């Protein structure tokens, strides 16, 4: 069995971000809320980027219907808790990554207590699909100045090249993030039209496609498809874009701190 060599495994990040920033990434703690079609790819990309500590939050279990778009969904993991399946996968990618699994759904009642005591994470990715959870996470992250990315809805989207990253004020074609924007403005005084809200989002500028007509009522009166369709090329792109933003946050924070120290 070959011993794990972090220097060789993550040397590409040293050359891309610089030794200091890459070290900051490897010492970072990132929380991912929702380990599904988008969040599982976030966790995968963070582990492959050498992030040293991850907190994964989700209560769902892997199902057959997840196999088309979720990286931890395999024939061997069906029925397993998503956070545990992801932890096992990460151990094979980056054995030095410390992974904490929290089997729960985030809600206004348990956030941020669900994180436990101790230092705040260095960054958070919200990849859940509940507006109430997205709202409490976004407001908390802004209040505590924690780098944060909120991910929109990937269902009903086919074109990966239309995925974008922008401030919440500029998001289009995403009912989930539109609700987040509305509630931040209504309940927390977020800036109105024309001004940045300060919440970075991953979303698609593609219009949501309804389920195909072939997924209509069967002859026996049952449906053969449920909800919006989805494809891994889009869900993975959402997740990778979110992680790209977080890695840049961490790198930029290191560079800023270094420059301030010189001054």
Q: Where in this protein do the model-derived segments appear?
A:
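Hydrophobic/small residue at the entry helix of a nucleotide-binding pocket
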Residues: 38
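Conserved SAM/SAH-binding loop
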Residues: 102-111
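Glycine-rich phosphate/adenylate-binding loop
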Residues: 2-4, 116-123, 130-136, 143-144, ...
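Conserved N-terminal Rossmann-fold NAD(P)-binding element of oxidoreductases
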Residues: 32-34, 57
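N-terminal charged helix/coil linker that caps or initiates catalytic domains
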Residues: 1-31, 64
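Glycine-rich phosphate-binding loop and adjoining beta1-alpha1-beta2 segment
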Residues: 51-94
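Short gly/pro/ser/thr-enriched loop/turn and capping motifs at secondary-structure boundaries
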Residues: 62-65, 154-160
């Amino acid at each position: 069995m070959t011993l794990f060599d972090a220097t060789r495994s993550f040397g590409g990040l040293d050359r891309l971000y610089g030794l200091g920033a890459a070290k900051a990434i490897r010492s970072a703690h990132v929380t991912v809320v929702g380990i599904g079609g988008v969040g599982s790819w976030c966790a995968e990309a963070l582990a492959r980027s050498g992030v040293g500590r991850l907190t994964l939050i989700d209560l769902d279990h892997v199902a057959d219907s997840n196999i088309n778009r979720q990286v931890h969904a395999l024939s061997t993991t069906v029925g397993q808790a998503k956070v545990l399946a992801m932890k096992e996968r990460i151990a094979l990618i980056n054995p030095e990554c410390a992974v904490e699994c929290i089997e729960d759904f985030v809600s206004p009642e348990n956030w941020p207590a669900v994180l436990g005591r101790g230092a705040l994470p260095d960054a958070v990715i919200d990849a859940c699909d509940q507006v109430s959870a997205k709202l409490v996470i976004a407001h908390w992250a802004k209040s505590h100045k924690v780098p944060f990315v909120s991910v929109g809805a990937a269902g009903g989207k086919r074109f990966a090249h239309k995925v974008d990253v922008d401030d919440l004020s500029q998001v289009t074609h995403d009912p989930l993030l539109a609700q987040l924007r509305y509630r931040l403005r209504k309940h927390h005084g977020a800036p109105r039209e024309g001004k940045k809200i300060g919440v970075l989002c991953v979303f698609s500028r593609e219009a949501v496609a309804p389920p195909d007509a072939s997924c209509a009522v069967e002859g026996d009166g049952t449906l053969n498809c449920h909800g919006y369709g989805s494809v891994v090329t889009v869900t993975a792109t959402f997740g990778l874009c979110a992680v790209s933003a977080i890695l840049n946050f961490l790198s930029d924070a290191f560079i800023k701190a270094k420059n301030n120290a010189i001054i």
